[in-house]
Amino acid sequence: MANPDFKSPHEIWPQLYQLEKELEFWISSGAFSDRELAARFHERIETIHPFTNGNGRFGRILTGQICKRRRFEMPTWGRALKSEPGKRRQTYIAALTRARRSGDYDALILVLFS
């Protein structure tokens, strides 16, 4: 059974196009801080979920590339919890889910930049 948090296969290309346009707007308008823009982009690309496997890695690469090109602070992906990999993953997934479902990006920003 499909995960209702992720997009259906037929929605992937339109959603990627929409995300590209939103990213352009977020950057040009200064709608969000650098950290929040990175978190919002990361949540959206993970929700679009374009691949069967490897979405997390793909999302981290794209988010990092956007930060690098825009000269934003680079995400550290929860490095503060590196000694506890299980907790690090659980914290990341909980923060991603919270952002996806409630629009509250604070926890995800904390994970991305701690």
Question: Predicted regions span which residues?
Answer:
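FIC/Doc superfamily catalytic core
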Residues: M1-S114
